[in-house]
């Protein structure tokens, strides 16, 4: 959103303008450690606040049901071309409104109600759309779950193979919302081929790492790949479908429109195009490497302070802190760090005895604060800040000290310094 747009908003609707200004200030003043969140560039914000929001464009480039799409076609085609180049895919659909919508379109294209799907148990790091009973994926299909090894807390490919051989799924899903280790897509493909299943990789969390070669790519191994375009990819909130099989790609296109969506959000697609262009630059590869280095610095810093990290570390952008060793729940820890302006989220652990509303874990991620420019030294300081807070929950002096250290870090790495809504216009 440009300064001009903010000026217009402040004059037209001061109530909303004030709320946006308050949210901007919250983002500036907090250490954002939610693993699924990031800060887009000003260019992505501007694209999403553009006149493209005015245009209906059902269909695909050059195959629209509405007139006046000649420039919309150029925008969407550029997004498609950049996505294909970025991920090395033969086909890309940039229209899904979200990662959940992308997954649903894949299900519609490949499955019939009652078919068997196999995905990771939500409590082990899976996702709602991978077969949770409260999601449409768990209501329309027969769901078989796999999890991590109790001892290593990592994927056990031999056990996954045993489950697949027994259950004969039509679709196997890999890719997770809370798994800190490298995914071996080639091993999943061997299992899928053995049972005659399609293989879907949901790389929503690791897309930016995959795009820059910091995580193995699923494109050569999986029939279809879905992702969000925010998180480590640092684009607008949206979804994306990729495949190396152009013929399968046609099925996914039809499953998106008219199968599950109507008009695409072309202003968001423009934001995706901008983000893909940014991700193709050398600076983004440097950023992705720093995301991993920072996550490892944070994990190692917490380990040095006596905390247990699930699987004893991380190879990507996130980690799970097992709080049982300090007698604390995820809910309690979430509240304690929130009180000192740190944003994280409680999270279930593998074999967690607590409910999803309480949990035994805290999920932390490095993408957002890496975007603000922080490096290993700052993430070691963040580890100590978190440790000081959680190990001294009743100490008001420690609480204030920690809050001051958070403020100092945020001040050193400003967020969107060019964005401000005129206070006079709001008042």
UniProtKB/Swiss-Prot annotation:
Its cofactor is pyridoxal 5'-phosphate. The record marks 230 as: Plays an important role in substrate specificity. It is found in: Cytoplasm. The lineage of its organism: Bacteria, Bacillati, Cyanobacteriota, Cyanophyceae, Oscillatoriophycideae. Homodimer. Keywords: Amino-acid biosynthesis, Cytoplasm, One-carbon metabolism, Pyridoxal phosphate, Transferase. It comes from the Bacteria. GO terms for cellular component: cytosol. It comes from Gloeothece citriformis (strain PCC 7424). This is Serine hydroxymethyltransferase. Catalyzes the reversible interconversion of serine and glycine with tetrahydrofolate (THF) serving as the one-carbon carrier. This reaction serves as the major source of one-carbon groups required for the biosynthesis of purines, thymidylate, methionine, and other important biomolecules. Also exhibits THF-independent aldolase activity toward beta-hydroxyamino acids, producing glycine and aldehydes, via a retro-aldol mechanism. (6S)-5,6,7,8-tetrahydrofolate binds at residues 122, 126-128, 355-357. Pathway: One-carbon metabolism; tetrahydrofolate interconversion; Amino-acid biosynthesis; glycine biosynthesis; glycine from L-serine: step 1/1. It is an enzyme of class 2 (transferase). GO terms for molecular function: glycine hydroxymethyltransferase activity; pyridoxal phosphate binding. Its EC number is 2.1.2.1. InterPro entries: PyrdxlP-dep_Trfase, PyrdxlP-dep_Trfase_major, PyrdxlP-dep_Trfase_small, Ser_HO-MeTrfase, Ser_HO-MeTrfase-like, Ser_HO-MeTrfase_PLP_BS, SHMT-like_dom. It catalyses: (6R)-5,10-methylene-5,6,7,8-tetrahydrofolate + glycine + H2O = (6S)-5,6,7,8-tetrahydrofolate + L-serine. One of its GO terms (biological process) is tetrahydrofolate interconversion. Belongs to the SHMT family. The modification N6-(pyridoxal phosphate)lysine is found at residue 231. Pfam families: SHMT.
């Amino acid at each position: 959103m440009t300064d001009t747009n903010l000026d217009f908003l402040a004059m037209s609707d001061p109530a909303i303008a004030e709320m946006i200004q308050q949210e901007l200030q919250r983002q500036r003043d907090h250490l954002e450690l939610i693993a699924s969140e990031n800060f887009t560039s000003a260019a992505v914000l501007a694209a999403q606040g553009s006149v493209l929001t005015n245009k209906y464009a059902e269909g695909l480039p050059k195959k629209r049901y509405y007139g006046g799409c000649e420039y919309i076609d150029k925008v969407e085609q550029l997004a498609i071309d950049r996505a294909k180049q970025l991920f090395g895919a033969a086909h890309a659909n940039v229209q899904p409104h979200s990662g959940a919508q992308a997954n649903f379109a894949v299900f519609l294209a490949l499955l019939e109600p009652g078919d068997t799907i196999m995905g990771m148990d939500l409590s082990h790091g899976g996702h709602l759309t991978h077969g949770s009973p409260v999601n449409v994926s768990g209501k329309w299909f027969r769901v078989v779950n796999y999890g991590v090894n109790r001892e290593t807390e990592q994927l056990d490919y031999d056990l996954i193979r045993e489950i697949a051989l027994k259950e004969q799924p039509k679709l196997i899903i890999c890719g997770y919302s809370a798994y800190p280790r490298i995914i071996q897509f080639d091993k999943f493909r061997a299992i899928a081929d053995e049972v005659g299943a399609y293989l879907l990789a949901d790389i929503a969390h690791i897309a930016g790492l995959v795009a820059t070669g910091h995580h193995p790519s699923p494109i050569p191994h999986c029939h279809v790949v879905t992702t969000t375009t925010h998180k480590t990819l640092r684009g607008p909130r949206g979804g994306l479908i990729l495949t190396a099989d152009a013929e399968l790609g046609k099925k996914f296109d039809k499953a998106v429109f008219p199968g599950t969506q109507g008009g695409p959000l072309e202003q968001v697609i423009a934001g995706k195009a901008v983000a893909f262009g940014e991700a193709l630059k050398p600076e983004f590869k440097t950023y992705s490497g720093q995301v991993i280095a920072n996550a490892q610095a944070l994990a190692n810093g917490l380990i040095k302070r006596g905390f247990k990290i699930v699987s004893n570390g991380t190879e990507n952008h996130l980690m799970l802190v097992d709080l049982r060793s300090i007698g604390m729940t995820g809910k309690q820890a979430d509240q304690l760090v929130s009180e000192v302006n740190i944003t994280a989220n409680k999270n279930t652990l593998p074999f967690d005895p607590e409910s999803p509303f309480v949990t035994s874990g805290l999920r932390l991620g490095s993408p957002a604060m890496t975007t603000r420019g922080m490096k290993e030294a700052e993430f070691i300081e963040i580890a100590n800040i978190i440790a000081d807070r959680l190990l001294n929950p009743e100490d008001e002096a420690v609480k204030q000290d920690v809050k001051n250290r958070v403020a100092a870090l945020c001040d050193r790495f400003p967020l969107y310094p060019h964005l401000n809504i005129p206070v006079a216009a709001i008042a």
